[in-house]
């Protein structure tokens, strides 16, 4: 079910945060929503892969890659793990790769851009802590809604 971020903002402006970052949409789902999980990692995707290997239960993984476009944090295999394990979407404050293949996957995926260079895999980073970028704080357990107009965050679920 698509939920328009503009309509949500009109109805709940007092509690919503709107992310100012202009993401590109890469996944097969143009609109997605779910409870937030987070990972902070810089040019290393081992922790991100580990999280997407667990049941997502319709959650959205917000990845704070520090805005780096130097290496890709998500490729088609990692995005495929998200599909297999029931994640609704991934928002990457960084780069992805395998963009054409990701476009055929049933998952929402937004990122700053793409780069074919793979990341390191040491496991550096931290999970399930608040992360912030684009004037917005992404807190685990809060809700993220995304569509063609952008990304908004609410402290609770806003739809039936």
Curated annotation (Swiss-Prot):
InterPro entries: RraA, RraA/RraA-like, RraA/RraA-like_sf. It comes from the Bacteria. Substrate binds at residues 75-78, 97. Keywords: Lyase, Metal-binding. Its cofactor is a divalent metal cation. Pfam families: RraA-like. Coiled coil: none annotated. GO terms for biological process: regulation of RNA metabolic process. The keyword DNA damage does not apply. It catalyses: 4-hydroxy-4-methyl-2-oxoglutarate = 2 pyruvate; oxaloacetate + H(+) = pyruvate + CO2. Its EC number is 4.1.3.17, 4.1.1.112. One of its GO terms (molecular function) is 4-hydroxy-4-methyl-2-oxoglutarate aldolase activity. Divalent metal cation. A divalent metal cation binds at residue 98. It is an enzyme of class 4 (lyase). Belongs to the class II aldolase/RraA-like family. Homotrimer. Catalyzes the aldol cleavage of 4-hydroxy-4-methyl-2-oxoglutarate (HMG) into 2 molecules of pyruvate. Also contains a secondary oxaloacetate (OAA) decarboxylase activity due to the common pyruvate enolate transition state formed following C-C bond cleavage in the retro-aldol and decarboxylation reactions. This is Putative 4-hydroxy-4-methyl-2-oxoglutarate aldolase. It comes from Rhodospirillum centenum (strain ATCC 51521 / SW). The lineage of its organism: Bacteria, Pseudomonadati, Pseudomonadota, Alphaproteobacteria, Rhodospirillales.
């Amino acid at each position: 079910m698509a939920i328009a971020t503009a309509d949500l903002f009109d109805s709940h402006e007092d509690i919503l945060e709107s992310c100012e970052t202009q993401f590109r949409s890469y996944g097969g789902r143009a609109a997605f929503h779910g409870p937030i999980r987070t990972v902070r990692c810089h040019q290393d995707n081992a922790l991100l892969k580990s999280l997407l290997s667990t049941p997502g239960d319709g959650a959205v993984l917000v990845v704070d890659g520090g805005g780096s476009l130097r290496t890709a944090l998500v490729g088609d295999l990692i995005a495929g793990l998200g599909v297999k394990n029931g994640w609704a979407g991934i928002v990457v404050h960084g780069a992805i790769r395998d963009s054409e293949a990701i476009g055929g996957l049933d998952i929402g995926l937004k990122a700053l851009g793409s780069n074919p260079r793979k990341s390191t895999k040491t496991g550096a980073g931290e999970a399930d802590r608040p992360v912030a970028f684009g004037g917005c704080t992404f807190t685990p357990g809060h809700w993220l809604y995304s569509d063609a107009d952008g990304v908004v965050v609410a402290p609770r679920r806003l739809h039936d």
